[in-house]
């Protein structure tokens, strides 16, 4: 079965950056004028600057980057433990991965780059933040009237027919509180069974009302992805390519693979108004069972810079500022929403990275792969194949410590 692909994008491993603090100012500039104050890298190139050119200490950044070389993940480079960790694979995996790598952006410029940042590797659940962006585009286009609408009002493929599933809203999916019940591509939403789920298998429990319990669950995210496909009626990698990745100058090296058994029939109207069932592949929200988004660190950095700039790229608003704000904020209006989780973005609201501002946030994937964004200091850090946890907190601490006091 052929794999669904979009263009491939260069990858620039983990980006660790520190930027000098800037006092907020009130601006009356027009959007075009405001955008002219920011640097946006043209396709195929990216300007480098010394940290000291942007208010940071050169030696401190160099030391932080040197420290990262001691923090590579112990995951085998050949993905040989994939089944043990996650269970039976459904899609492809590369033969090997790159070593630890990353890039640090300050004010949009590269101030540090290490390892092979063009290697195209699986990024695991960082892909969820890309799905979040497609979700935002869907709302921006009016394809969904309200994020609190039940998904079943829009999607009629049987996935939301049962009374319990009929209560699930788009917001529930985006906050991982949906409690959707069913099976996707041979994987049950219960996560029961060692063979199917490896070390990630769960214990039996009672199902809760949608919106009342957070559970990190890739089966439900894959259901969410299929629902978005049902609205767009074209492969989501194509949506991502034309609406986001091409406009930000991403490379042609990134790939979004589907599972081998993830071909579905989508009802697509033709020019005369008649409907035709068109086979399409539905993408996953990660690489837990193979497939998923394979991308370079440098392309991740472009995506991170777009989010840092609140959805604007070089004078063009690709996705609304309102969506970026909602996606990177907690949602206490839902009883089960996690206080440090937005719409498929991890937040620092609970001080997971103690030295970093509470306003910073990250796309996170196993491996560990991460795109950390710090709007307060105008930083983006992409870091690939690191130990995660305390290592992340320490790296951000070292980057932030490199910010020189304002004169």
Label for each model-derived stretch:
Residues 110-118, 180-261, 286, 291:
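Catalytic-site signature segments of enzymes, centered on catalytic residues
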Residues 47-49, 69, 73-94, 123, ...:
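Active-site-proximal loop and beta-strand segments within enzyme catalytic domains
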């Amino acid at each position: 079965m052929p794999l669904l692909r979009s263009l491939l994008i260069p990858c620039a491993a983990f980006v660790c950056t520190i930027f000098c603090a800037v006092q907020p100012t009130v601006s009356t500039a027009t959007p075009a004028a405001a955008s002219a104050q920011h640097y946006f890298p043209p396709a195929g190139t990216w300007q480098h600057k010394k940290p000291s050119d942007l208010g940071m200490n050169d030696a401190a950044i160099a030391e932080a980057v040197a420290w990262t070389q001691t923090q590579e993940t112990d995951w085998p480079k050949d993905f040989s433990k994939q089944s043990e960790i996650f269970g039976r694979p459904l899609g492809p995996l590369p033969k090997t991965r790159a070593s630890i790598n990353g890039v640090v952006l300050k004010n949009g410029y590269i101030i540090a780059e290490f390892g092979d940042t063009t290697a195209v590797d699986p990024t695991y659940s960082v892909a969820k933040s890309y799905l979040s962006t497609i979700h935002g585009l869907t709302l921006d286009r009016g394809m969904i009237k309200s994020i609190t609408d039940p998904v079943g009002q829009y999607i009629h493929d049987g996935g939301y027919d049962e009374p319990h599933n009929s209560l699930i809203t788009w917001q529930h999916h985006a906050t991982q509180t949906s409690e959707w019940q069913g099976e996707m591509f041979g994987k049950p939403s219960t996560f029961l069974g060692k063979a199917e789920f490896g070390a990630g298998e769960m214990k039996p429990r009672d199902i809760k009302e949608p919106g009342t319990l957070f559970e990190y669950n890739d089966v439900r995210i894959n259901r969410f992805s299929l629902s978005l496909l049902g609205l767009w009626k074209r492969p989501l990698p194509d949506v991502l390519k034309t609406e986001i990745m091409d406009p930000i100058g991403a490379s042609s090296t990134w790939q979004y693979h589907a599972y081998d058994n993830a071909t579905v029939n989508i009802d697509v109207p033709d020019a005369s108004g008649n409907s035709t069932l068109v086979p399409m592949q539905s993408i996953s929200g990660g690489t837990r069972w193979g497939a998923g988004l394979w991308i370079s660190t440098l392309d991740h950095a472009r995506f991170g810079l777009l989010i840092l700039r609140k959805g604007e790229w070089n004078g063009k608003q690709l996705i609304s500022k309102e969506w970026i704000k909602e996606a990177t904020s907690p949602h206490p209006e839902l009883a089960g929403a996690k206080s440090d989780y937005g719409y498929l973005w991890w937040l620092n609201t609970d001080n997971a990275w103690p030295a970093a501002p509470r306003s910073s946030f990250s796309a996170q994937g196993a491996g560990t792969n991460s795109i950390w964004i710090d709007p307060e200091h105008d930083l983006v850090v992409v870091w690939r194949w690191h130990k995660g946890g305390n290592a992340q907190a320490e790296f951000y601490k070292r980057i932030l410590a490199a910010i020189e006091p304002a004169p």
